[in-house]
């Protein structure tokens, strides 16, 4: 599971997830990519689950890049605990996703196989996504 090795602070405030993705919105490593068209949060488990679906479908062919990293801690108080007494412990880590963010990239496979693999991966994610190709500059 992905999570930071160390952080400056253990817990974070909830904050807002506004705007569009400026960084990480272009296909920069692979040939094809899975791009988010919605806003939301991806947990480390969801990122790993989609990665497994991708790698299993392409088998040994192709190289895969994960372009998102869960760096935001989400805390939760235990069940049946009264309010107050401080913020709960960190339960899991999430990556905040804005529309236009590239989530996964792949290269070394045909477009048809890439589309199938990304369809399987997208089914594991709670966001609406789209398939994009690299544009030659």
From Swiss-Prot:
Residues 1-13 have a biased composition (Basic residues). Residues 1-20 are annotated as: Disordered. PROSITE patterns: RIBOSOMAL_L16_1, RIBOSOMAL_L16_2. Keywords: Ribonucleoprotein, Ribosomal protein, RNA-binding, rRNA-binding, tRNA-binding. One of its GO terms (molecular function) is structural constituent of ribosome. GO terms for cellular component: cytosolic large ribosomal subunit. GO terms for biological process: translation. Binds 23S rRNA and is also seen to make contacts with the A and possibly P site tRNAs. Belongs to the universal ribosomal protein uL16 family. This is Large ribosomal subunit protein uL16.
């Amino acid at each position: 599971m992905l999570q930071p090795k160390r952080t400056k602070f253990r817990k974070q405030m909830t904050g807002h997830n506004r705007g569009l993705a400026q960084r990480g919105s272009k296909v920069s490593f692979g040939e094809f990519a899975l791009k988010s068209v919605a806003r939301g949060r991806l947990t480390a488990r969801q990122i790993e689950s989609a990665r497994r679906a991708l790698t299993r479908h392409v088998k040994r062919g192709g190289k895969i890049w994960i372009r998102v990293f869960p760096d935001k801690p989400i805390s939760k108080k235990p069940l049946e605990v009264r309010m107050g007494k401080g913020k709960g412990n960190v339960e899991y880590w999430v990556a905040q996703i804005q529309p236009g963010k590239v989530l996964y990239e792949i290269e070394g496979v045909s477009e048809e196989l890439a589309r199938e693999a990304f369809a399987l991966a997208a089914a594991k994610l709670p966001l609406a996504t789209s398939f994009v190709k690299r544009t030659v500059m």
